[in-house]
Regions:
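Catalytic domains of carbohydrate-active enzymes, especially glycoside hydrolases
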Residues: 35-62, 142-150, 259-260, 319-332, ...
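Short, acidic/polar
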Residues: 30-46, 130-143, 245-251, 313-324
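The substrate-binding groove and active-site-proximal loops of carbohydrate-active enzymes
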Residues: 22-33, 59-74, 118-137, 198-214, ...
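Aromatic-lined carbohydrate-recognition surfaces of secreted/lumenal glycan-active proteins
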Residues: 20-32, 90-98, 152-156, 202-246, ...
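Hydrophobic targeting/anchoring helices
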Residues: 48-51, 56-57, 160-162, 196, ...
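A conserved amphipathic helix/loop scaffold
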Residues: 415, 419-420, 430-666
Length: 666
């Protein structure tokens, strides 16, 4: 089974000339070589047109006195900024650490209270300690006195360092005073590990965590405001700490500034493109869907880590940024583009690709603004019933194994993530976990439209009593079968039995489009049906439901094949009543579609190492024109023709390359 793994600020921080897509590029901390870093920043602006550079300062306490490190680091930023005097480069700061990303290892430390985690380990310094609190104030005061163009905090401002924090004496005293309890740290850890979300002790500890993080950011902002309240700020969120992040972004923003938040959407070491990218694409889409209308400007995490071509190629770097702009994010945080690490220049390939495409991202952001999504609708959740602050069980906006990651991208089928289930669209439920997070009302609303339901989700729906609306009863049985028969195409599909087979019993009025069955050998005329496998049903709510035995947990050889893709597309055609738009290629491919003013805007990304010589699409529509967005931001005409039921475009697509096409209808 494949592992699943996509801004223009207010006037107070009008950061970048590019419309609606701002790059926050990080520059290497370069003590003694600030002139080199500044020269790099000037060249970066000249070549790419992006003017904002954040000088990276790792400011969590180290050494004794810890403030000495801060003085030296801030002085280095001052030299960097001075080297840029007279240049249009806007010198900002990335506070790469203030609490610290991971447990401490240095010897010379301040006598401040350490955080204690859920395993009883001493980890970082606790912000409740007066000494450390003053350190935070002093640090941001010194930063503000340099009047940076922007201050971005990093994702070390989080409520865990491997494990949940904080059970230090200061937090325990505060907790017990508020709750009127006398817990020891060990007793509270044990209590919380077994507690549910509505437990009063759980809620009280959760509030302390939020206050701990909020206190750090509010203290930082207060220190900045005491010096220069016009300095804009933003935050980076840690992966799956989304229950904390929005208040932090708002607290870090200057008065009148739109909050800025870098999302947790990185894809660092890209060794397994087809496995890692679908998860990343889906996360970007889900972040944008979840925070749409929140008033927060979202940045994707386009970091190259460890900041070289062993991590990420320049092509994939641009593809990552393209995905972010297409899904509607407002910009990206990038690392060390056109910078140095010590005496070694970071590959200028990253600079080259931005220079060659300096008009591309702003034009894309403008093109998708105000557009509507098309494609299968994957649920984006706003409830997190299984999220637990102590056991480290995290839930994201979309469930792992969802249809977007595991089925749509491998087959080049467009999808979207959605929070509301009232709209007339085709929904996709792939996992039991998705069904568990949906209320009965949510499910009824979905089932009054069009829905494709994969095996595990079908079983969960049957257990919830929705057989009358799906047209399928699902039971576990020991079935005898060795294949699936696709009656739409008259072919057999790979499908092996297991200890967890499901028997589908279809409503008599349902249409069975494929079956599980037994054939003694390939080509044998005998075929004994064991269960329906693809069932199409029109229910009493006016909905149409396609329920299938196919599911994301199957082995790859069963999940992905030309025959399997043809079966799914034909079944979706029957569900929707029209030809399903999709890639015309039998290979891994991101295909996302937005519609605007009679045009389709299509993002395609080739995730297969097999290059595509001519892009093609399975489409129900004829088109008047086809255009491709060029690096300079212009739309170039593409020769296209219909051939064998596909729209064939005379434009290639290399491995991990992205293309944005615009189809104008006749």
């Amino acid at each position: 089974m494949r592992e699943s793994m996509t801004c223009v600020l207010a006037a107070v921080c009008a950061l970048n000339a590019v419309a609606d897509f701002t790059l926050y590029n990080v520059a290497q901390f370069s003590p003694g070589n600030e002139n080199v870093a500044a020269a790099d920043a000037k060249e970066y602006l000249e070549r790419t047109g992006n003017d904002l550079v954040l000088y990276s300062l790792t400011l969590h306490p180290e050494g004794r006195p810890a403030i000495e490190k801060v003085r030296r680091y801030v002085a280095s930023f001052g030299k960097f900024k001075a080297e840029l005097a007279g240049s249009p480069v806007r010198a900002g700061i990335l506070v790469q650490a203030i609490l610290g990303h991971w447990p401490r290892v240095d010897k010379d430390i301040e006598d401040w209270t350490r955080t204690i985690d859920a395993k009883g380990n001493k980890v970082r310094f606790c912000p409740l300690d007066p000494g450390f609190a003053q350190y935070i104030t002093d640090t941001f005061t010194m930063l503000a006195k340099e009047h940076p163009a922007f201050i971005l905090t990093d994702d070390d401002i989080r409520a865990f360092s491997h494990e949940a924090e904080c059970f230090c004496p200061l937090h325990m005293d505060l907790f017990n005073k508020r709750r009127g309890t006398s817990y020891t740290a060990d007793a509270l850890r044990k209590k919380l590990a077994a507690a549910k979300q509505d437990d009063p002790d759980y809620l009280a500890f959760f509030a302390l965590q939020r206050e701990m993080l909020g206190g750090v950011v509010k203290r930082a902002r207060a220190a900045i405001d005491a010096v220069d309240p016009s300095i804009p700020g933003g935050t980076c969120i840690a992966s799956e700490e989304h229950l904390f992040c929005a208040p932090l972004a708002r607290a870090m923003a200057a008065r009148g500034q739109t909050p800025v938040m870098r999302t947790a959407t990185a894809s660092y070491m890209e060794r397994m493109t087809a496995a890692g990218v679908p998860r990343c694409v889906c996360r970007m889409m889900a972040f944008e869907e979840y925070y749409r209308g929140s008033g927060i400007e979202l940045l994707c995490e386009a970091d190259t880590w460890p900041h070289n071509l062993w991590s990420k190629s320049s092509r994939s770097f641009l593809t990552h940024l393209t995905t972010a702009a297409f899904v509607g994010m407002n910009g990206a945080k990038t690392w060390y583009v056109n910078s140095h690490k010590g005496p070694f220049a970071v590959s200028r390939s990253y600079t080259d690709v931005l220079a060659e495409n300096r008009g591309f991202l702003p034009a894309l952001a403008e093109a998708v603004a105000g557009s509507a999504w098309e494609g299968l609708a994957v649920p984006c959740f706003t409830n997190f019933p299984g999220w637990h602050l102590v056991t480290n069980h995290r839930e994201f906006f979309v469930e792992s194994g969802n249809a977007g990651e595991t089925i749509c991208i491998p087959f080049g089928i467009p999808f979207q993530t959605v929070r509301d289930f009232d709209a007339d669209r085709t929904y996709a439920l792939a996992t039991a976990a998705e069904v568990a997070r949906l209320s009965d009302g949510d499910l009824r609303r979905m089932l009054s439209h069009k829905v494709v339901v994969f095996r595990d989700a079908a079983e969960a729906l049957s257990k919830r009593g929705f057989d009358a609306l799906t047209g399928v009863k699902v039971e576990r049985r020991n079935l005898v079968f060795n294949r699936e028969r696709d009656d739409m195409h008259g072919v057999d599909l790979a499908f092996s039995p297991s200890s967890k087979d499901r028997l589908f019993t279809a409503n008599p009025s349902a249409e069975v489009l494929s079956t599980l069955g037994y054939r003694p050998f390939a080509g044998a005329p005998q075929y004994d049906v064991a269960s329906p496998a693809t069932v199409l049903f029109a229910n009493a709510l006016g909905g149409r439901v396609l329920t299938v035995q196919y599911h994301p947990k199957m082995e790859n050889y069963q999940l992905y094949s030309e025959a399997r893709r043809a079966w799914l597309l034909a079944a979706l055609d029957r569900l929707s009543g029209e030809k399903t738009f999709a890639s015309g290629h039998d290979q891994d491919m991101v295909v996302l579609v937005r519609r605007k003013a009679g045009e389709q805007i299509v993002l395609v990304e080739n995730l297969s190492s097999e290059p595509i010589r001519r892009l093609s699409f399975r489409t129900p529509s004829a088109y008047r024109t086809v255009q491709r967005l060029a690096g300079d931001g212009s739309w170039k005409a593409v020769d296209a023709r219909f051939d064998d039921g596909k729209l064939v475009c005379e434009t290639p697509l290399a491995f991990y390359e992205a293309a944005v096409l615009r189809f104008a209808s006749k």
